[in-house]
Protein backbone atom coordinates (compact mmCIF):
# COMPACT_ATOMS: atom_id res chain seq x y z
CA UNK A 1 0.00 0.00 0.00
CA UNK A 2 0.98 3.63 -0.31
CA UNK A 3 0.04 6.77 1.60
CA UNK A 4 0.93 10.38 0.98
CA UNK A 5 0.38 13.91 2.20
CA UNK A 6 1.12 17.44 1.00
CA UNK A 7 1.42 20.49 3.27
CA UNK A 8 1.52 24.14 2.28
CA UNK A 9 1.26 26.59 5.19
CA UNK A 10 -1.76 28.89 4.97
CA UNK A 11 0.06 31.94 6.28
CA UNK A 12 0.91 35.29 4.78
CA UNK A 13 4.58 35.27 5.83
CA UNK A 14 6.82 36.27 2.88
CA UNK A 15 9.21 33.35 3.42
CA UNK A 16 6.42 30.73 3.38
CA UNK A 17 4.23 31.81 0.49
CA UNK A 18 6.01 29.39 -1.84
CA UNK A 19 6.78 26.62 0.63
CA UNK A 20 5.42 23.07 0.37
CA UNK A 21 6.31 19.61 1.64
CA UNK A 22 5.12 16.26 0.29
CA UNK A 23 5.63 12.83 1.87
CA UNK A 24 4.89 9.43 0.35
CA UNK A 25 5.21 6.13 2.19
CA UNK A 26 5.16 2.81 0.35
CA UNK A 27 5.13 -0.82 1.41
CA UNK A 28 4.99 -3.22 -1.51
CA UNK A 29 5.24 -7.00 -1.95
CA UNK A 30 5.65 -8.65 -5.34
CA UNK A 31 5.30 -12.43 -5.67
CA UNK A 32 6.61 -14.78 -8.37
CA UNK A 33 9.23 -12.25 -9.38
CA UNK A 34 10.96 -13.15 -12.65
CA UNK A 35 14.71 -12.60 -12.86
CA UNK A 36 18.13 -14.22 -12.97
CA UNK A 37 20.23 -15.63 -10.14
CA UNK A 38 23.83 -14.47 -9.99
CA UNK A 39 26.65 -16.95 -10.57
CA UNK A 40 28.11 -16.54 -7.02
CA UNK A 41 24.68 -17.31 -5.54
CA UNK A 42 24.21 -20.37 -7.77
CA UNK A 43 27.57 -21.86 -6.81
CA UNK A 44 27.29 -21.01 -3.11
CA UNK A 45 23.78 -22.47 -2.87
CA UNK A 46 24.75 -25.68 -4.69
CA UNK A 47 27.58 -26.26 -2.23
CA UNK A 48 25.30 -25.48 0.74
CA UNK A 49 26.94 -22.22 1.79
CA UNK A 50 23.51 -20.91 2.81
CA UNK A 51 21.82 -24.19 3.74
CA UNK A 52 20.19 -24.63 0.32
CA UNK A 53 21.62 -28.11 -0.31
CA UNK A 54 22.39 -29.86 3.00
CA UNK A 55 22.70 -33.25 1.30
CA UNK A 56 25.03 -31.90 -1.42
CA UNK A 57 22.78 -33.56 -4.01
CA UNK A 58 23.55 -33.18 -7.70
CA UNK A 59 19.79 -33.03 -8.28
CA UNK A 60 19.58 -29.75 -6.36
CA UNK A 61 18.07 -26.90 -8.40
CA UNK A 62 21.22 -24.77 -8.12
CA UNK A 63 23.56 -27.64 -9.02
CA UNK A 64 21.54 -28.19 -12.18
CA UNK A 65 22.36 -24.66 -13.36
CA UNK A 66 26.01 -25.38 -14.20
CA UNK A 67 27.99 -28.13 -15.89
CA UNK A 68 31.20 -29.82 -14.70
CA UNK A 69 33.83 -32.16 -16.01
CA UNK A 70 34.51 -35.47 -14.29
CA UNK A 71 37.38 -33.72 -12.50
CA UNK A 72 34.90 -31.25 -10.99
CA UNK A 73 36.02 -28.28 -13.07
CA UNK A 74 33.10 -25.98 -13.90
CA UNK A 75 32.64 -25.46 -17.64
CA UNK A 76 29.56 -23.25 -17.79
CA UNK A 77 26.76 -21.65 -15.78
CA UNK A 78 23.21 -21.07 -17.03
CA UNK A 79 21.52 -17.84 -15.92
CA UNK A 80 18.01 -18.36 -17.22
CA UNK A 81 14.91 -16.39 -16.24
CA UNK A 82 13.29 -18.03 -13.21
CA UNK A 83 10.66 -17.21 -10.60
CA UNK A 84 12.57 -15.77 -7.65
CA UNK A 85 9.76 -16.11 -5.11
CA UNK A 86 8.97 -12.74 -3.50
CA UNK A 87 10.33 -9.23 -3.01
CA UNK A 88 9.18 -6.92 -0.21
CA UNK A 89 10.20 -3.30 -0.03
CA UNK A 90 9.28 -0.22 1.98
CA UNK A 91 10.46 3.35 2.24
CA UNK A 92 9.66 7.04 2.19
CA UNK A 93 9.96 9.63 -0.59
CA UNK A 94 9.84 13.32 0.27
CA UNK A 95 10.00 16.60 -1.62
CA UNK A 96 10.44 20.13 -0.31
CA UNK A 97 9.94 23.26 -2.43
CA UNK A 98 10.71 26.74 -1.13
CA UNK A 99 11.10 30.07 -2.83
CA UNK A 100 11.10 33.76 -1.95
CA UNK A 101 12.08 37.16 -3.29
CA UNK A 102 15.31 38.63 -1.94
CA UNK A 103 13.42 41.89 -1.53
CA UNK A 104 11.76 40.19 1.46
CA UNK A 105 15.19 40.41 3.13
CA UNK A 106 15.35 44.13 2.54
CA UNK A 107 17.41 43.91 -0.64
CA UNK A 108 16.50 45.84 -3.81
CA UNK A 109 13.85 44.41 -6.14
CA UNK A 110 16.60 43.90 -8.71
CA UNK A 111 18.30 41.33 -6.42
CA UNK A 112 15.97 38.67 -7.80
CA UNK A 113 14.62 35.55 -6.12
CA UNK A 114 15.85 32.26 -4.68
CA UNK A 115 14.20 28.86 -5.12
CA UNK A 116 15.14 25.56 -3.50
CA UNK A 117 14.04 22.03 -4.35
CA UNK A 118 14.93 18.93 -2.34
CA UNK A 119 13.98 15.39 -3.34
CA UNK A 120 15.04 12.73 -0.84
CA UNK A 121 14.40 8.99 -0.61
CA UNK A 122 14.79 6.66 2.35
CA UNK A 123 14.82 2.91 1.63
CA UNK A 124 13.78 1.13 4.82
CA UNK A 125 13.91 -2.42 3.47
CA UNK A 126 14.40 -4.44 0.30
CA UNK A 127 13.86 -8.08 1.23
CA UNK A 128 14.22 -10.84 -1.33
CA UNK A 129 13.81 -14.59 -1.40
CA UNK A 130 16.27 -16.56 -3.49
CA UNK A 131 13.58 -19.20 -4.07
CA UNK A 132 10.09 -20.06 -2.76
CA UNK A 133 9.97 -20.88 0.97
CA UNK A 134 13.48 -19.52 1.50
CA UNK A 135 14.17 -16.96 4.21
CA UNK A 136 13.93 -13.31 3.24
CA UNK A 137 17.25 -11.43 3.09
CA UNK A 138 17.26 -7.64 3.42
CA UNK A 139 19.47 -5.97 0.80
CA UNK A 140 18.70 -2.34 1.72
CA UNK A 141 21.92 -0.35 1.70
CA UNK A 142 23.77 -2.78 -0.57
CA UNK A 143 25.09 -2.83 -4.12
CA UNK A 144 25.89 -5.80 -6.32
CA UNK A 145 25.12 -7.85 -9.39
CA UNK A 146 22.72 -10.27 -7.69
CA UNK A 147 20.15 -7.56 -6.96
CA UNK A 148 17.20 -6.28 -8.91
CA UNK A 149 18.21 -2.71 -9.66
CA UNK A 150 21.87 -3.16 -8.74
CA UNK A 151 22.23 -0.28 -6.28
CA UNK A 152 19.93 0.00 -3.26
CA UNK A 153 21.19 2.91 -1.13
CA UNK A 154 19.33 3.60 2.10
CA UNK A 155 19.53 7.33 1.36
CA UNK A 156 19.70 9.30 -1.87
CA UNK A 157 18.83 12.90 -2.58
CA UNK A 158 18.98 15.76 -5.07
CA UNK A 159 19.11 19.37 -3.84
CA UNK A 160 18.84 22.30 -6.25
CA UNK A 161 19.23 26.01 -5.55
CA UNK A 162 18.25 28.54 -8.22
CA UNK A 163 18.93 32.28 -8.27
CA UNK A 164 16.81 34.20 -10.77
CA UNK A 165 17.47 37.83 -11.70
CA UNK A 166 15.17 39.03 -14.45
CA UNK A 167 15.71 36.81 -17.51
CA UNK A 168 18.82 35.12 -16.08
CA UNK A 169 18.77 31.97 -13.92
CA UNK A 170 21.66 30.13 -12.27
CA UNK A 171 21.22 26.69 -10.68
CA UNK A 172 23.56 24.64 -8.50
CA UNK A 173 22.54 21.00 -8.03
CA UNK A 174 23.90 18.48 -5.50
CA UNK A 175 23.35 14.76 -6.10
CA UNK A 176 24.00 12.43 -3.16
CA UNK A 177 24.03 8.63 -2.84
CA UNK A 178 24.79 7.14 0.57
CA UNK A 179 27.54 4.58 1.14
CA UNK A 180 26.61 0.97 0.34
CA UNK A 181 27.77 -2.49 1.38
CA UNK A 182 28.80 -5.07 -1.19
CA UNK A 183 25.83 -7.45 -1.59
CA UNK A 184 28.23 -10.38 -1.36
CA UNK A 185 28.53 -9.63 2.37
CA UNK A 186 24.80 -10.23 2.89
CA UNK A 187 23.74 -12.23 4.82
CA UNK A 188 27.28 -13.44 5.68
CA UNK A 189 30.50 -11.44 5.40
CA UNK A 190 32.63 -11.93 2.29
CA UNK A 191 36.38 -11.23 2.55
CA UNK A 192 36.42 -10.18 -1.13
CA UNK A 193 33.65 -7.61 -0.71
CA UNK A 194 34.28 -4.03 -1.87
CA UNK A 195 31.98 -1.42 -0.33
CA UNK A 196 31.21 1.97 -1.88
CA UNK A 197 31.62 5.30 0.00
CA UNK A 198 29.24 8.26 0.05
CA UNK A 199 28.98 9.67 -3.47
CA UNK A 200 28.44 13.39 -4.13
CA UNK A 201 28.30 15.19 -7.47
CA UNK A 202 27.69 18.90 -8.17
CA UNK A 203 26.26 20.40 -11.36
CA UNK A 204 26.17 24.08 -12.33
CA UNK A 205 23.91 25.47 -15.05
CA UNK A 206 22.45 28.75 -16.23
CA UNK A 207 19.99 30.16 -18.72
CA UNK A 208 19.21 33.54 -20.29
CA UNK A 209 15.78 34.19 -21.72
CA UNK A 210 16.53 36.68 -24.48
CA UNK A 211 12.87 37.05 -25.45
CA UNK A 212 9.69 34.97 -25.60
CA UNK A 213 11.14 32.86 -28.42
CA UNK A 214 14.85 32.37 -27.64
CA UNK A 215 16.59 31.06 -24.51
CA UNK A 216 20.31 30.38 -24.21
CA UNK A 217 21.57 27.77 -21.73
CA UNK A 218 24.95 26.42 -20.61
CA UNK A 219 26.45 24.50 -17.75
CA UNK A 220 28.93 22.04 -16.32
CA UNK A 221 27.89 18.59 -15.13
CA UNK A 222 30.03 16.86 -12.48
CA UNK A 223 31.73 20.13 -11.65
CA UNK A 224 34.44 18.56 -9.44
CA UNK A 225 35.10 15.70 -11.91
CA UNK A 226 34.13 13.12 -9.28
CA UNK A 227 35.06 9.53 -10.22
CA UNK A 228 32.48 6.78 -9.72
CA UNK A 229 33.22 4.36 -6.87
CA UNK A 230 34.98 1.17 -7.87
CA UNK A 231 33.69 -2.27 -6.97
CA UNK A 232 34.01 -5.67 -8.57
CA UNK A 233 30.66 -7.42 -8.23
CA UNK A 234 28.83 -5.64 -11.07
CA UNK A 235 28.57 -7.58 -14.38
CA UNK A 236 30.83 -6.54 -17.26
CA UNK A 237 32.14 -3.42 -15.50
CA UNK A 238 33.81 -2.19 -12.33
CA UNK A 239 31.02 0.20 -11.28
CA UNK A 240 27.28 0.79 -11.72
CA UNK A 241 26.77 3.22 -14.63
CA UNK A 242 23.03 3.44 -13.92
CA UNK A 243 23.72 5.00 -10.50
CA UNK A 244 27.06 6.79 -10.82
CA UNK A 245 28.43 9.33 -13.29
CA UNK A 246 30.99 7.55 -15.46
CA UNK A 247 31.61 10.40 -17.94
CA UNK A 248 33.29 12.86 -15.58
CA UNK A 249 33.22 16.64 -15.95
CA UNK A 250 31.56 17.86 -19.13
CA UNK A 251 30.37 21.20 -20.49
CA UNK A 252 27.22 21.82 -22.49
CA UNK A 253 25.72 24.78 -24.34
CA UNK A 254 22.40 25.01 -26.09
CA UNK A 255 19.67 27.23 -27.45
CA UNK A 256 15.91 26.83 -27.31
CA UNK A 257 14.03 28.61 -30.06
CA UNK A 258 10.33 28.80 -30.87
CA UNK A 259 9.17 29.62 -34.38
Locations of regions flagged by a protein language model:
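Residues that define the transmembrane beta-barrel architecture of outer-membrane proteins
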Residues: 1, 88-92, 153-157, 198-202, ...
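Membrane-embedded beta-barrel scaffold of Gram-negative outer-membrane proteins
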Residues: 1-62, 88
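Transmembrane beta-strands of outer-membrane beta-barrel proteins
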Residues: 3, 17-23, 94, 112-118, ...
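Residue-level signature of outer-membrane beta-barrel architecture
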Residues: 7-9, 98-100, 163-165, 174, ...
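Short loop/turn motifs that connect adjacent beta-strands in outer-membrane beta-barrel proteins
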Residues: 10-19, 55, 85-87, 101-116, ...
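C-terminal beta-signal and adjacent terminal beta-strands/loops
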Residues: 29-32, 124-127, 173-185, 207-259
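Flexible glycine-rich, low-complexity coil/linker segments exposed to the extracellular/periplasmic environment
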Residues: 38-89, 128-131, 150, 162, ...
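C-terminal beta-barrel architecture of Gram-negative outer-membrane proteins
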Residues: 114-209, 224
Amino acid sequence: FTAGAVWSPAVDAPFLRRFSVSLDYYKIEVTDVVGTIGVPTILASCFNADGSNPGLSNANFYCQQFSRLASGQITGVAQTQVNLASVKTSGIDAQVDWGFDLADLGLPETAGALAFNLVISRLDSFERQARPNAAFVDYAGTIGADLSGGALPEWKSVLSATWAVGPVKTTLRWRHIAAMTDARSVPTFSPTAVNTPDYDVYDLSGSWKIDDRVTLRAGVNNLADQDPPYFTSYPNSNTDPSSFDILGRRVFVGINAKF
